[in-house]
Amino acid sequence: MNIFCHALFLLLLGVVSCQNNNRNVKPGGKPAKKPNNPAIEATQHGPEADPNSGLAGAGDSSKETNPGGRGSSQQSASVNKPADDMKLHFLKNTAVTCNDGTAAGFYLKEFKGSKRWLIFLEGGWCCYSKETCDSRYKTIPRLMGSTDWPQTRRGSGLLSAQVDENPHWYNANIVFVPYCSSDVWSGNKAASKPKQGKETEYAFMGSQIIREVIKDLVPKGLKQAKVVMLAGTSAGGTGVLLNIDKVSSLLEQQGAEAQVRGLVDSGWFLESKQQKVPDCPDSASCTPADAIKKGLRLWNGVVPEKCKQQYKRGEDWHCFFGHKLYSYISAPLFVVQWLFDEEQLRVENIYMGSQSLSEQQWTYMQNLGKELKNSLKDVTAVFAPSCLSHTLITKSNWTDFQIKGTSLSRALQCWDRSFQEANKNSKTALKGCPFHLIDNCQWPQCNPTCPALIDQATQQEMTLLQVLASMGLDLQKLGLDVRGDISAGMVSNGG
């Protein structure tokens, strides 16, 4: 697998930054095989993980301590509060597995007395053929099996147990579901034969994993819940779109009376405007639509029935795109989406800071922001800043980002209050408490709270104009003021 493809896989992870402070264990409680790296870390892979990229969003990776290595156990015990950690539980139904046949599971941090549950689906793109799955298994095995999962994890952002980092949801029961099915949480296919030697017959059971997680949580208090939030980033966000109504129905069947809501972060993609290699032999050359078309057959993927009925046989891949699926979803949804999502740009071969940028690509970037904005206008609850980044809710500084003076944390709280005072489909915001927030300004980074752009070579912050100039754009020809900071003018435009 070439380095570009490997880097793309890492960029699409969208995983949570966590700390693990116990030894790895297998489902039976026996020590797992030792990984090549003795200090396994679950980190958020943002643009800074890409060797081909010269820019990163500041704050894309949360700071974390590394408990691995000799003599670190006592130190980590004093630094970390065990009560804040999520503990690993493997599924009771052992027939529902990860890609490689190892046990699937979830991490849980209970908050005694709480009737609110936050269930988070991890992201990580997908594989859609024997070749792409073999490459994925070789380079990122933890996204296809549970052998090296840590016994505990610590959440960040909306998954944090710290009130200052997570003021509205710190006191909820928090569940983190690791992504190990590579099927955008849609698969319904068991392996046809057991693993033989080095040859692996992959299972794709993402949809079933979610079902079994819900079943296993019912006796742990989920049945008594008043509010259940199914959240996810990137591929996990798309997984929320695909599974939210099924989760609601399953809980109803289990006798629960909870209101089920969905939170979709960076999982609202648009179809590519530029057709790439038709056969798309690897992830680097495959658009989301092409990957989903191929993957659906491999995964025996399941999409919401109401949406599926709108398309001809073999065309149900359309239901993976939020702007086409949204109107067929019954459960309330809150969509979080950067208007200039880095992964959406990468689909179009636009890599900020790592290559030249043509005038056509610059124009396309601006049009992308407009198209995304237009696709979100009828979404009841939305937070869409005009920034260059990918994923938001698991960043440790997630409360810093604002639109028109309102943070995402505040918008979520306003959305929560709206259920107590209004119909779920009402667009009437509570006075001074909005939850439909889309930046008005048209340019990338025109919101003053956007994550900073960092030059990876110098680690210095750069303005958007500096980035564009470094990529070869003639700013004067485009009518951009090279002498001043244009952000002030853009912000006054309503951002």
From Swiss-Prot:
Keyword Cell inner membrane: no
InterPro entries, A to Z: PAE/NOTUM
GO molecular function, one term: palmitoleyl hydrolase activity
Annotated region (Disordered), positions in chain: 24-80
Keyword Secreted: yes
Principal cellular location given in the protein's record: secreted
Swiss-Prot/TrEMBL GO biological process terms: motor neuron axon guidance; negative regulation of canonical Wnt signaling pathway; negative regulation of Wnt signaling pathway; protein depalmitoleylation
Descriptive protein name: Carboxylesterase notum2
Organism field: Danio rerio (Zebrafish)
Designated gene of the protein: notum2
